[in-house]
């Protein structure tokens, strides 16, 4: 919690002190498409049966079936790394709230709501695609191949219900989508190359640390983590680009007790 607070304070200081560009984002038809795709993938994932890993499944696992690139993950297991990955993910996930708060202070609700809406779309799409892929692929997590853990220990871990959700890494995907969203939107909103470099380095560093910790925890193979990083990066970069004002069709107007969303025909 302390590290999260320090990161946000650092970001807030530089946001309030930096020169701001014209706000370039708006709601448009892409907002509808992104929300629909994210929502539909999430609903589709909920319709699929939860993948179950039984003690018989665990006993039948053979590490020799794992490719050499991924095999080292079957020797990893660390509850501490698992917990730490939640912390690093949490820090990078909440960081965009500093920019939303800055927009609220500078320009009022309209810009803050648009920025927050873009971030929610990013999370919805990242999470929906991830959940659907996990339920379709049903790859067993590497820790269940780990012979240093007894069959009983692995059976207890499998009882949590996520033993076959290895591909791909959701923590890594969300961390990278949040990190790239944060840094790329900062570049559009502020003219400060020094802070930009620091922000890219720190946010991508946290996302990379999240992926590494998922590996050390025995939760994911390297290919799971690499895939999550690529997909998260793509979504985190593309969603805000899809909201640049050149494609403006929607306007969100806050009222005293309401919000009005208007569509403009071209």
Task: List each language-model region with its residue ranges.
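Membrane-interface helix-boundary motifs at transmembrane edges
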Residues: 23-26, 41, 105-113, 190-193
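Generic beta-strand or strand-like secondary-structure segments
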Residues: 93-100, 115, 128, 132
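Solvent-exposed, amphipathic alpha-helical segments
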Residues: 97-101, 208-211
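Hydrophobic alpha-helical transmembrane segments of multi-pass membrane proteins
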Residues: 81-84, 116, 120, 169
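N-terminal transmembrane-helix/juxtamembrane module of multi-pass inner/ER membrane proteins
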Residues: 20-96, 137, 141-152
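Structural signal for the C-terminal ends of transmembrane alpha-helices
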Residues: 100-107, 185-187
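Interfacial segments of alpha-helical transmembrane regions
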Residues: 104-129
């Amino acid at each position: 919690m302390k590290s999260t607070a320090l990161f946000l304070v650092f970001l807030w200081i530089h946001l309030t002190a930096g020169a701001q560009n014209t706000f370039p984002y708006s709601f448009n038809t892409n907002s509808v498409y992104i929300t629909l795709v994210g929502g539909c993938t999430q609903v589709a994932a909920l319709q699929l049966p939860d993948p179950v890993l039984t003690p018989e499944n665990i006993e039948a696992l053979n590490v020799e079936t794992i490719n050499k690139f991924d095999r080292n993950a079957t020797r990893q297991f660390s509850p501490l790394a698992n917990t730490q990955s939640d912390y690093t993910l949490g820090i990078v996930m909440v960081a965009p709230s500093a920019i939303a708060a800055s927009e609220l202070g500078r320009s009022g609700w309209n810009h803050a709501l648009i920025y927050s809406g873009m971030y929610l779309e990013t999370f919805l799409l990242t999470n929906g695609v991830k959940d659907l892929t996990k339920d379709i692929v049903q790859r067993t997590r590497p820790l269940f191949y780990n012979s240093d853990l007894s069959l009983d220990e692995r059976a207890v871990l499998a009882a949590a219900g996520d033993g076959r959700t290895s591909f791909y890494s959701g923590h890594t995907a969300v961390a990278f989508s949040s990190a790239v969203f944060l840094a790329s939107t900062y570049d559009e909103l502020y003219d400060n190359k020094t802070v930009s470099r620091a922000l890219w380095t720190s946010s991508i560093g946290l996302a990379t640390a999240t992926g590494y910790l998922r590996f050390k925890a025995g939760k994911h193979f390297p290919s799971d983590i690499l895939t999550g990083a690529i997909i998260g990066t793509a979504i985190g970069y593309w969603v805000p680009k899809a909201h640049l004002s050149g494609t403006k069709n929607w306007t969100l107007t806050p009222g005293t007790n309401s919000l009005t969303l208007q569509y403009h025909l071209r």
